[in-house]
From Swiss-Prot:
Forms a complex composed of PxpA, PxpB and PxpC. HAMAP family: PxpA. Belongs to the LamB/PxpA family. One of its GO terms (biological process) is carbohydrate metabolic process. It comes from Staphylococcus aureus (strain MRSA252). This is 5-oxoprolinase subunit A.
Length: 250
């Protein structure tokens, strides 16, 4: 049994510094690097790619909506053409830094609202998947398990990775509980670990209404901007190793 452990990183920009990237990155197998639209900038991207290479961590693009103020977590009325173009633009930016450090982009995981839009809207998911395929058909598209991001990526011929979340609660249909709700984020370490083991070992999660939902767990996400990110990542890694589960990049 194997699983990938990923984290959204490189999300500082300008004079705004947060997250424990230097402490987290040695503990994970895949880093999703912000590409400048929702967070990150040229200096942070360069440093994050360099850091990932130093720790043999797979580098992935983490493109988001153009919304620094809202951290890319607010829905924006945006056309399919704009979505396609912003995907290509951000992938190109990350590829530049990967090239100078002789690292290959391994995967793509949309951020925040763009991720949720693609998970719930088949047409948007198709646009995202097509952009990734057109940029590089060998890339892995990471998306919410059982969502349109996964099905549409498969339709265009991409390799996919179904993602589950250690620090988020689930609806009965397998979607994530909206961050607008007070109970959307898991902050208790024991609860997060229990959820992770159930998802990885049984391919199931218990929804907020106590319903058992089936899902595929190829990669586990911990949000790098979360208050308990470092603790969660270290404890998840520890318990997976204790259970004999291999932690490998996608």
């Amino acid at each position: 049994m194997r699983v990938d452990l990923n984290c959204d990183l490189g999300e500082a920009f300008g004079n705004y510094f947060f997250g424990g990237d230097h402490q987290i990155i040695p503990l994970i197998t895949s880093a999703n690097v912000a590409c400048g639209f929702h967070a990150g900038d040229e200096n942070v991207m360069n440093e994050t790619v360099k850091l990932a290479k130093a720790h043999n961590v797979a580098v992935g693009a983490h493109p988001g909506l153009p919304d620094l103020k809202g951290f890319g977590r607010r829905n924006i009325d945006i056309s399919n053409e704009e979505i396609y173009n912003l995907m290509i633009y951000q992938l190109g930016a990350l590829q530049g830094f990967c090239r100078i450090h002789q690292v290959k982009i391994n995967h793509v995981k949309p951020h925040g609202a763009l991720y949720q839009m693609g998970a719930k809207d088949r047409e948007i998911a198709s646009v995202i998947a097509q952009a990734v395929y057109d940029f590089d058909p060998s890339l892995v598209l990471v998306g919410l398990a059982n969502s349109y991001l996964i099905s549409e990526a498969k339709n265009v011929g991409l390799i996919t990775a179904s993602e589950v979340f250690a620090d988020r609660r689930y609806e009965d249909d397998g979607q994530l509980v909206s961050r607008k709700e007070s109970d959307a984020v898991i902050t208790d370490t024991d609860e997060a670990l229990k959820q992770v083991l159930k998802m990885v070992k049984e391919n199931k999660v218990i929804s907020k209404n106590n319903k058992e939902v089936t899902l595929q767990a190829d990669t586990i996400c911990v949000h790098g901007d979360g208050e308990h990110a470092l603790l969660f990542v270290s404890k998840i890694r520890e318990i997976l190793m204790k259970e004999g589960i291999d932690i490998q990049s996608l």
